[in-house]
Amino acid sequence: MQVLILGSGVVGVTSAYYLATQGHEVTVVDRREAPAMETSYGNAGQVSFGFSSPWAAPGIPRKALKWMFQEHAPLKIQPKRDPAMARFMMAMFNNCTPERYAVNKERMVRVAEYSRQCIDALRRDTGIRYEDRQRGLLQLFRHESQVEAAGKDMRVLSECGVRHRLLGAEELVTAEPALARVPGKFVGGLHLPDDQTGDCHLFTQRLAEHCREHLGVTFRFGVDVQRIERQAGRVERVVTSAGSLRADAYVVCLGSFSPLLVKDLDIRLPIYPVKGYSLTLPVTDDGGAPQSTVMDETFKVAISRFDDRIRVGGTAELASYDLSLLEKRRATISMVVRDVFPEGGDAAKAEFWTGLRPMTPDSTPIIGATRYDNLWLNTGHGTLGWTMSCGSAHLLADLMAGRRPAIDPIGLDVSRYAA
């Protein structure tokens, strides 16, 4: 089967990998000059299977109002006349009930835990390395109320078989020794020993190279996808800046831009671009730097360790497709890394970056078939595209081949929004 994949971020390239390993003839097109040059370029670096949690959680509507007046709030909303933003926020708030949170959390962990198995196997099969570390994730709590709230997540983790351990303040250094340099700052933490860290951009580029050299995947860069044309319930072709492209099957992996492409096909994807920021700092003191990933629960900022760099990612900004770099957001994530690892990296030499996360109102990705029998979706992963990429792609490849997938796909395709 000839398959055309639209998008060469981490989700598109992993989709190409799993489809090609099943014997399909795969072509990937992207408007950029290389793989992983947009959202996959500078993300936080955490591969956080156990930490996969919905943004839409009980109490978030009240917190969102409070955050509007805080300087270093994890969520910022740029005032705009944007009906799509209003619809997204309303739908997200509707998912903030305990019942919806539990359903969405289970779906996310289902995909994420499968993705852990898939990326471990991929690493063994291909031998690619991407400054990766398999040393877990530590969620840091500054307040006792956060420790109490973590109990709900821990119950879901237990039900899903995810290893975890609640640490007291004095135990945090067993997971991250550098925290000994900031005593009294945190009251506890949740340690997820099976979570991982790695450079998503490097992973995607090296996997694309592997796909080209060993699996015969064709990559066409600098090609702008303009529209999809249909006929009699099927996609007939994709019109691009380089002409029309035809295949037996088509996969949309365009992140935040996916809804713009498929809306003319009467497919409504409730995906909204949520802007995130990151800093990349050179390590100056190995003993004062993180060894894996820590997540500051108060500011929703992740701090991850690569070989000789620290990646700091955070902030959720609703500003449509605006990619301007705001110094106020830099100040927030810079403040957090200086507060947690004050001696670990050189903030003066940091690279500042922003990208658009493709968020769904229930935080769950959209994976599977559409009303067109040769059009498939693998998109809407929000902040967890890196975490869920391999599992999502393997699931998609099995569904496209008519195989029974390793995990239950119920509740993951676009039909869940039809009600």
UniProtKB/Swiss-Prot annotation:
A GO cellular component annotation here is: cytoplasm
Keyword Oxidoreductase included in the entry's annotation: yes
This entry's Enzyme Commission designation comes to: 1.4.99.-
Q: Which SUPFAM superfamilies match?
A: FAD-linked reductases, C-terminal domain, FAD/NAD(P)-binding domain
The enzyme's first-digit EC class, named in words, is oxidoreductase
Query: What cofactor is needed?
Result: FAD
- List all membrane-crossing ranges: none
The biological processes this protein is annotated with in GO are: D-alanine catabolic process
Q: Which domain of life is it from?
A: Bacteria
Q: What is this protein called?
A: D-amino acid dehydrogenase
Gene it is expressed from: dadA
